[in-house]
Amino acid sequence: MKISASIYSDKLRPLAEVIQDLDAHQVDLFHVDCNDDPSVFTDIAEIRKWSTTPIDLHLITEKPEAYFELLRENPVDYLTFQFEKLKAPLRLPKDIQGKKGIAITTDTPVDIFQGFSEFDFILIMATTPGQSGGKFDQHNFQKIRKFRKMYPTKSIHVDGGVNGEVSFILRNMGVSSCVSGSYLFNAPSIGQALMNLTKREIESSFQIKDFMVPADECPVCYSHLHSAKEIVQVVDQGKLGFALVLKDDGKLIGIVSSADIRKGVLKKWDEPQQINISDIMNTSPLTILETATVVELLKLIKTCSFPVMYMPVVNSIGHAVGIINFAHLIKGEI
């Protein structure tokens, strides 16, 4: 996951010094907020003289067309428009360079992206726009999951309230880039803050249930209702690479993954018609309680001698309530 440093969050030092410091720490992107202020492009022109680091511009304006010529003169690498500010359909000239995104606040549903399907990414504002240092609103975890499901090939960027713990969760959910401002510049050093945003050892206050994929969004089978073939079909149709297998009351019996299916087929290669549920189901998967913290999750993973791609989440009486899907972590690191 890329870290996009919000350059105007450092209000104490000259811009040139901020840019030099960020480059010395090899930050991935420079995040530039333009709140209907054309003079920002003077700064962009200066930054281009000092650095080759990609520029991530967030344009907050009712009249984006007023900035098209400035964007032609000062092309940026990432260009985001704030949805709530737009008063008319956004018609972007084809010669405007850079990857395009649309930004939404916490209260705006991700469904609006259907009007911008040609764009490359969505930027989810996880705190109140313009308020530096706000707390991450955990409702945005659900929005990220929904957007990932609706637009699996699009990138997700997040701005606001991202600390070390939230950063780990976002990486796990496949977020491509996060904007960091006050957290980055209020730390004892930029280097320490960057380490906190990218390291695997973190403090934790969020629980697994805050960011897991809930059971009602997972492929689910019931052992007494489904044959082995039907379970394989559920895995295939679910497009997540697994299915939870439950009892009538919702208690977890096991999990069937694509890897488990391959093992079952190899086991009964000469008599495929004899494959039954027990041949393809892992009846003792690694699970975690919904009330566990991120730190407890990491400690559990460290005890494993095998790679963990899926981890069912259960409640205190063993009922399946969701799953942690580590496949998205790979997307977030690309």
Regions found by a protein language model. Give the residues of each.
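Short loop-to-alpha-helix "cap/lid" segments that border enzyme active sites
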Residues: 44-50, 83-169
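Short hydrophobic beta-strand motif reused across regulatory alpha/beta modules
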Residues: 254-259, 321-329
